[in-house]
Amino acid sequence: MKIMNKQSITIFLIICFLINLILSCPNYPEPIKINQNDPTLQKAYKEVDEIIKKGMKDNGIKSFIASIVYRDEIVWSKTYGNVNPLDENSPPLTIDNAIRIASITKTFTDLMMFQLRDKGTISSLDDEVSKYFPEFSIGNLYNTKKSPTFRELSSHQSGLPREVPCDFDDLADWDICSEEVIIERLSKMFLIMPSYQSTHYSNLGIALLGRTLAKAANTEYEKYVKEKILFPLGMMNSSFYYDDVKDYLAQGLILWPNGSYTISPVEELGWSNPMGNLYSTARDMCNYMMFWLNENPEILDSTTLNEAMSPISLLNDGDTVYGTPFEMFYDQANSIWVKSKAGQLSGYRTQMALIRPLKIGMLFSSLLAFQTPDVFTKAASEILIPVYEQLLYEAGSQPQSPFIPDSKLKPTLTTEKYSKEIPNDAFVGTYTNSEGSIFIVDNSTGLLIANFGDDNLFNVSRFSDQYPEILRIKVSNPQDYLCRYVVDGSNYELVYFTITSTPFGGIECNSVTAMGQTMTLASKDPQYLKNNNIEFEKRNKLISKFLQ
């Protein structure tokens, strides 16, 4: 009986731990420079290597390219096999051999869309495609008058059929599969479902998106991507055209049912290029991943980059999400989202996976199309994430704050209101109003900590050197709360103090506005309410209102 009781207690504690893990809101260490030669990290890379080799063996893959980036550098890469997998005398693969990235091309098309929206070339992502491409039409028998929009096309929510209405073997022929032919065929077809009824992956939608964007920008799609995306990112060995890369193209294979292999023919996509015809190298794609993991305002505004990587549609499995056009999955083991895009054409299967909170990116490419849920990136991420988090914390990394630090705030031309820094002591005190609102600032630990008269604590930090009277509050331990509390409550709010000068040249705060409520200083003592047994009958009313 005693043994059973101990077992029951152990099981209960495990269940409590798992519930807390599931219900808590994870936070991640700030990506800082770490020692890439650390034995723990080198062991992790070796395990990734073993995963790839096992996957190659299990799926009959003869040649493979893998690269991992962290922050702004390639930290690990390895190639397996030869440029021609069927010729042992062929040169060994390198990360400078071209591959077909197939549907990863869609991320370039969507990036073009965000650029043109930000420039004002298209006025809104919710503009209907027909506004810029009046020749396009498709039948609609549903109870809606709306035609597909840029946002719907870019995120597979348009209800368009999956494929361009042209035989695959003819796509490269601009006469057989000309724009006029495709548009004429579409005019006799119908939407397969209303927009936003369900995610329906559509190569046609992205091809139409790219061609419509080109019309809006009065240019060719391929020319735009080359000049506005590829070259600015240093992707000089990437192209939409076979002739540009044929001298360094890695050869893809076809594996037949009888176990034999042949070199896959290269069939280009013509009008459908925006959906999947970009050739690139692993080195070039590392530059591309580093763009998504970091910031490059010359390519895309940082706020738009966040928008571009946001979810659009949650699938019924509860942990898979479609974006524009990233396909995202939640790594349950490590409590983190992985933003991914995979592509497959005859002879090639490639996946780009981005773990943006940690600034880790993976580009894995097989010179053989094969059928598995991913290109080994999920297993690799499950190894890399905990190791990186451990090493980051050991290196002194602090938990992330998603707000913009002072170094990234836009300078203003206004004169600062205060000529000297406001000391932390000036903010300390208990602030109240007649409605029962409470805001308490304490620095007894050496750091500014705030609360709204309850047990939920907030770290307090400076907002900007230009506005020293404005502070920011952040939930002290977000991992202890539901994510809903973290995003729905007062987390990351700004609080505005009224500053006055004392007769002896000092500075004091006599009121504060927090969460829209203005409160005056009741006492410089943060324990004022508790020490005086003061209760405000409305004190919890406001608090609960903002936590609902």
Swiss-Prot record:
Keywords: Glycoprotein, Secreted, Signal. Its main location: secreted. It is found in: Secreted. Gene3D superfamilies: DD-peptidase/beta-lactamase superfamily (3.40.710.10). InterPro entries: Beta-lactam-related (IPR001466), Beta-lactam/transpept-like (IPR012338), Beta-lactamase-like_AB/R (IPR051478). It comes from the Eukaryota. Residues 1-24 form the signal peptide. Pfam families: Beta-lactamase (PF00144). Glycans are attached at residues 237, 258, 443, 459. The keyword Ribonucleoprotein does not apply. Coiled coil: none annotated. Belongs to the beta-lactamase family. This is Beta-lactamase-like protein 2. It comes from Dictyostelium discoideum.
